């Protein structure tokens, strides 16, 4: 439950950081 949700939140945060730093990459591949 909570641990999985926390990991998902971390993944979303990392994706946000990456997409904000590299907005020109093709993220449709992810």
From Swiss-Prot:
Hemolymph. GO terms for molecular function: oxygen carrier activity. GO terms for cellular component: extracellular region. Keywords: Copper, Oxygen transport, Secreted, Transport. Its main location: secreted. It is found in: Secreted, Extracellular space. Hemocyanins are copper-containing oxygen carriers occurring freely dissolved in the hemolymph of many mollusks and arthropods. Belongs to the tyrosinase family. Hemocyanin subfamily. This is Hemocyanin subunit 2. The lineage of its organism: Eukaryota, Metazoa, Ecdysozoa, Arthropoda, Crustacea.
């Amino acid at each position: 439950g909570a641990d999985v949700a926390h990991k998902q939140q971390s993944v979303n945060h990392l994706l946000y950081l990456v997409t904000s730093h590299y907005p020109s990459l093709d993220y449709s591949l992810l």
